């Protein structure tokens, strides 16, 4: 047996030629136990600088705006919390019924013509549940609110437009899938590959669904807007609000969506 181990434990024992006292062992053991107790204490999450359970609770700081945005029929309770300018989250308990209930989001206003923008990029990082029905997406508007461009980064449906969440479309398959029908497939632009859907919701809606879902990345929004323009959907629009959040159709029992890092860079 190792002479420096006590009863097989990892604490030091008596050294050769030294006087060994039981109280020394007791004091050492007490110190180890206290250290272990301290290390087991969880580090508390950073307290939010703002939170709201109001349907349209909103908050702004450093040019960024947050909105709880609970707008759908039959919506349940939801609380949005902001921890830092680029870090926020939402707890949402939405029933398992059809229709989008909410779009909690963070936003940044650009307010410039597309032709005068030399760069427009955004980075994201999020943690999302594995069940429910939802899509994490950019929602980009022109200043006149006549054009809405959605970029789905992660979602519970399928890239082909089928599943429990579907993009707005002029055409849906007349089969059990009821899938939205894309107008373009496998378009490589803005740093990813997308399927593109076109529809109308009181205004023109162009939805791009990533063919490979992800919880982190960087999107070249300028390149995507230029590609859409090249297809004749709009001219030199004035880019308005760039939003990022989650469209929640259902999150029964309450689910957490955490946005760990989100930013927009515009030049």
Model-derived segments and spans:
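Extracellular "spike/adhesin" assembly and maturation modules
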Residues: 1-33
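Long, compositionally biased interface segments
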Residues: 211-267
């Amino acid at each position: 047996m190792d002479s420096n181990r006590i009863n097989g434990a990892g604490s030091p024992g008596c050294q050769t030629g030294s006087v060994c006292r039981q109280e020394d062992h007791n004091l050492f053991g007490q110190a180890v136990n206290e250290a272990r107790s301290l290390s087991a204490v969880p580090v508390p999450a950073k307290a939010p600088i703002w939170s709201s359970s109001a349907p349209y609770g909103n908050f702004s700081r450093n040019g960024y705006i947050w909105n709880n945005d609970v707008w759908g029929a039959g919506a349940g309770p939801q609380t949005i919390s902001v921890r830092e300018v680029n870090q926020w989250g939402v707890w949402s308990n939405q029933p398992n019924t059809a229709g989008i209930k909410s779009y909690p989001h963070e936003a940044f206003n650009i307010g410039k013509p597309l032709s005068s923008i030399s760069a427009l990029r955004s980075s994201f990082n999020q943690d999302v549940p594995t069940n429910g029905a939802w899509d994490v997406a950019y929602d980009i508007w022109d200043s006149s609110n006549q054009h809405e461009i959605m970029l789905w980064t992660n979602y519970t449906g399928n890239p082909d437009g089928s599943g429990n969440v579907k993009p707005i479309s002029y055409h849906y398959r007349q089969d059990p899938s009821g899938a939205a029908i894309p107008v373009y497939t496998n378009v490589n632009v803005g740093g990813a590959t997308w399927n593109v859907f076109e529809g109308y919701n009181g205004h023109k809606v162009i939805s791009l669904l990533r063919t490979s879902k992800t919880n982190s990345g960087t999107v070249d929004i300028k390149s995507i807007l230029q590609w859409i323009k090249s297809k004749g959907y709009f001219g030199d629009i004035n880019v308005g609000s760039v939003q990022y959040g989650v469209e929640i159709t259902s999150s029964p029992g309450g689910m957490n969506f955490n946005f760990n890092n989100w930013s927009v860079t515009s030049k």
